[in-house]
Amino acid sequence: MTYKIMAINAGSSSLKFQLLNMPQGALLCQGLIERIGLPEARFMLKTSAQKWQETLPIADHHEAVTLLLEALTGRGILSSLQEIDGVGHRVAHGGERFKDAALVCDDTLREIERLAELAPLHNPVNALGIRLFRQRLPAVPAVAVFDTAFHQTLAPEAWLYPLPWRYYAELGIRRYGFHGTSHHYVSSALAEKLGVPLSALRVVSCHLGNGCSVCAIKGGQSVNTSMGFTPQSGVMMGTRSGDIDPSILPWLVEKEGKSALQLSQLLNNESGLLGVSGVSSDYRDVEQAADAGNERAALALSLFAERIRATIGSYIMQMGGLDALIFTGGIGEHSARARATICRNLHFLGLALDDEKNQRSATFIQADNALVKVAVINTNEELMIARDVMRLALPQARELTVSA
């Protein structure tokens, strides 16, 4: 038996979606509605056979959801909306409450909205997306899949900041971690490809895109991760600084009179690859500039790799060794240069790359005599979301989900 599951990612001015046939994971359609609220919004929808694109005014997310659902039947992808068996929603922040994906009910929604203080840019619109789909598909079960949930297995030594206790107890300031759905998916996919239980592996997963995070996975559980209270922390990213000396911030307030908003803009939108290179936040553009002799671009690439290498090294120490290293995300999946720079001179760990395999982004790119497996795995958060819908919302499908 097959089930049609929708995976939804609602952003502040966008709506990304996939419709999958489960448990096989076959993609029926995918698309994006962007620039919501503007007179020239764009709606893109594609199947394996066709692609549609339209520019039109879309006033709000309510219109976007209506447009999407009408297109599914209007384009013949579904004969009826009753064919949809479940909907999964990506939610940025689950706080300490959600240690797993959760069936959507009124209480779940209220908690997602309450947690908006921890993710003010994402949780409110995530909750709005859930409400709108519940209104249009009231009989269809829905599941909220939290980006933070996979990291709720961290020990206190990994998630607690050495601040006065009340800042954690009263304000919830601690490491939460993000990209959890991606790290969970690629580590599970690795174990499947190796034919080894994930519980038997020590893995470091590097999700490298415009946002970057590194995750240590031991015994099938996240034991450390580079992103913390916000997705701004950790390793260097496209426009985000990652970890810096915190005293730089009050120094800038005193020296340049910067406001909290200006500091946030500096750390989140003006730093990282863009800030160091002065060229771009796109790794490919910085690579091109470095190859043309731009010294700051070359330095940006080296700094990017060094921050990741240092994080990987600390996680290897924490886990007492390493069985496999995973690269995923736009940079991790497509940049042979990034992978080679991060993995250079690590023979003493039993980690070495095969240059030819790395250049063609093979699934496994380690040298033949290397002890540590190095894998390039395309992330698929939507498939992970659909699996969570199957597991939690469709009891009759649970056995199929486990075996898939």
Curated annotation (Swiss-Prot):
Listed pathway(s): Polyol metabolism; 1,2-propanediol degradation
Q: Could you tell me what reaction this enzyme catalyses?
A: propanoate + ATP = propanoyl phosphate + ADP
- Any idea of its EC number? 2.7.2.15
Q: GO CC terms on record?
A: cytoplasm
One GO biological-process annotation of the entry reads: acetate metabolic process
What's the chief localization of this chain? cytoplasm
Is Kinase found in the keyword set? yes
In terms of domain of life, where is this protein from?
Bacteria
- The top EC class, named as a word, is transferase
Transit peptide: present as a keyword of the record?
A: no
**What are the UniProt keywords, alphabetically?**
ATP-binding, Cytoplasm, Kinase, Nucleotide-binding, Transferase
Q: Give the subcellular location.
A: Cytoplasm
Question: Which GO molecular function, any one, fits this protein according to its record?
Answer: ATP binding
InterPro entries attached to this UniProt entry: Ac/propionate_kinase, Aliphatic_acid_kin_short-chain, Aliphatic_acid_kinase_CS, ATPase_NBD, Propionate_kinase_PduW
Give the HAMAP family listed for this entry.
Answer: Acetate_kinase, Propion_kin_subfam2
Annotated function: Works with phosphate acetyltransferase (pta) to capture exogenous propionate and regenerate propionyl-CoA during degradation of 1,2-propanediol (1,2-PD).
Family, per entry:
Belongs to the acetokinase family. PduW subfamily.
| Protein name per Swiss-Prot or TrEMBL | Propionate kinase
Gene name, please?
pduW
